[in-house]
């Protein structure tokens, strides 16, 4: 035990200096508005504020190691500083003499202060002055560094989030709980600025108090509070306290201290004796082990030398010797705040013993240092941090001591919280180094990727900046030399030059001048500049007054039309009439033609031939499925990406006012919420309105009257009436077999031969094979399916030739290596093998095939040896196109049963078919059942026929008297075969009526007789359509007699070729009596009908 004069000697020693400028500048200053921000402090640790106060003095028989830190206006403030007033020692005389003796001892020249007793740590110990002379010191004497208590059994627990703390690295935490703030200030006021920092397991929890030990990680750090300052996070919010913590060592939490009492062993820590209760302070007390508890006592003993302290102060020493000893913890004064603060009993977490010279540890340390260097080379920020840490006082120890090196690696990494906590909790140095190495390796991979991305971005930016800088220099040079004007001036001049070559109407010229004047006064960076520029560009792209000279040579037009298309007499005659009028008048107005016909008959291709014959430009666009009116009328200029409609786009592309515009699939226009495109076509196709067509984008009248519009459609029923009224309809019927034969021989076969690469090979496609294709494979009215089959034949022939000759007959051409060819023509292109040379290790490169060969040399066509001959006949046709699709043309060829008749139908694909009608009866209640996927109209035709038969049952001989009920006890079932094909239309009326009569009179109908026509309820036969296709189907099926309505005779004479009508007798009837007499001619019932159901006149007949 030391006498009181020793403490008096300590009281005369100079106070510790403030932190050096380096420490104060290296520590990041927390922002009051950003609480608890995690940051690293690799610079030397600043001195603690609580050690700046005076040495300990006895206050009311209590020892205080420190006083609250002084407020320097920078690091913090102490609300209790004004209350801490030092009281004089009880024995003023002894205190004064002790001070004088201490001064005399300190002035002796042989007594030297030494800092060799200071304790080193992983970072400068808070409170050290780095050997600097304290203010007011009389000489170069150094101040000893304080010793951090090695044993501190009870601490105030501060929960932290996001990242754990590591020994030797600062962190600022923000506390918002008023009791915890009060506890921290009490710790500073009593000279015990030590807390324990533990990481919360749940990062979403924001609390300053630990209520359960399982809320935090079991391993934390023992920290010293270096400075505190208050901050206001917002208006109306409570005041917060930001404390800067400096961790010293790892600790392990044992238990929480409850509010009922203090838990622990009750021993006094190394920090010194602190007051307990008020009664014990007034009672007896004794200082225990003061030499090891109060910093600086050993140094005082050194300075006193051999001076006998006991002899100089015998009374005081004797007085204190009798004080009673009472041991308490360092933070007993915080127990009154429980449970509003969390006090924990902790123990130091010791590192397992290890050999520093272990080969494994040294190898891992070397690898860590290497990774540090690699990251420092890639990331300048990381390099600055490591450099800043390297200038600290103890930086040389970090790379020599494994535990500190592992902690440094964990601090600088951005790993997960669990990985960082694992490094902190590890007690094995080797395991800790291994975990730190994994974290640092991940940082290296991230740094490499970041470096690569940064390098790529820099390269692009530098290239653009260089180009921009050179372009600006070039503009300046050209401007000085007068070689080129400003870009906007050049643009304006270009527009003026374009407009000068166009015959703009007066109104359009005025709009152009206004927009051009606006463009001149706009800055190129303005958003409206591009809008105005695009508008003027479209105005100058419209071919105002520019037209193509038309060719009205009739013979030339006939030659062009016949070369491209076979048949289509009506369409060709209409075009020739159009040209004849133009030749007489010298000019023609635009017309609107509508070509209606089944698919594949050449409606679209005939439009191209018409344009070619007239010498006009051709433009095609389809409106099938179109729902947006803006596609026709254009968009408003206010929209981004706005543009004119299709008519204006067509004029821009063809650059003439009189092109031929083909509007395809006009019968398939859709409707939507944003308008009806069919109605928008009215203005464009109306000859009275399209002279001043108004586009939404241009908003100036456009003359479309010189445009020849040709529309195509499959049916007329879906075209709106007002639109159909503005068009001249030309029906394009299907091709008959003879026409298909000519088209295949003259057009399809030569085209397919060239497409297959067999133009120089002797390939013979016999007419019999083509006829078999048409009869058994391609019965459609068009030739599109026929073209597909002919293409297939030539493809099979090409494959057969190559297979038969083999590789020896057709060798591959010898070419140099493809990669060398590319390198010779494009030296900047690198081989694929070099594309992965700069790839970062550990990454995958996709899309790079090192074996891919590329070339720019075109491949020469191969020569087929002469003498190769392929012949396609009707017999071997199935080897090329497979088995036939159609086998029988008629279901009944010989003696059909009663109740069967033969009708003619028009299929949806534009072809005709022979369709038998079958009727049977059974006992029932007089119901009529219809099957065969029949439509509504054909069902009505069956009901009409049934009603006519019932009303004329006596005349037909079905009943014996007119009053006899007919078929009330019989059910009738009507069926039309091929139920998978839908059937609709009124043209089966005569065939159904004939089948009813055949069933009820039990008389068969000749199978070589077919019929078509609609019947009325009173027995009249009405005309129907599709006669050409129906007659073609009858001709193909071998029908010898056709019963057709008399109203269809002009259509048959005009549109049906003689080749189709050959061998068929046509009977033109007007009522059902003529139909029945002709269908049952020569039978017994027909002879009886001559009296009961006579014909008014004989039907007209024609035999071909």
Curated annotation (Swiss-Prot):
Residues in Lon N-terminal domain copies: 155-444
InterPro entries: AAA+_ATPase (IPR003593), ATPase_AAA_core (IPR003959), Lon_bac/euk-typ (IPR004815), Lon_lid (IPR054594), Lon_proteolytic (IPR008269), Lon_Prtase (IPR027065), Lon_prtase_N (IPR003111), Lon_prtase_N_sf (IPR046336)
Transit peptide: 1-58
Family classification: Belongs to the peptidase S16 family.
Region (Disordered): 8-144
Gene name as annotated: PIM1
Reactions the enzyme catalyzes: Hydrolysis of proteins in presence of ATP
Taxonomic superkingdom: Eukaryota
Single Gene Ontology BP annotation: oxidation-dependent protein catabolic process
Listed name of the protein: Lon protease homolog, mitochondrial
Keywords (A to Z) from UniProt: ATP-binding, DNA-binding, Hydrolase, Mitochondrion, Nucleotide-binding, Protease, Serine protease, Transit peptide
CDD domains: RecA-like_Lon
Main localization category: mitochondrion
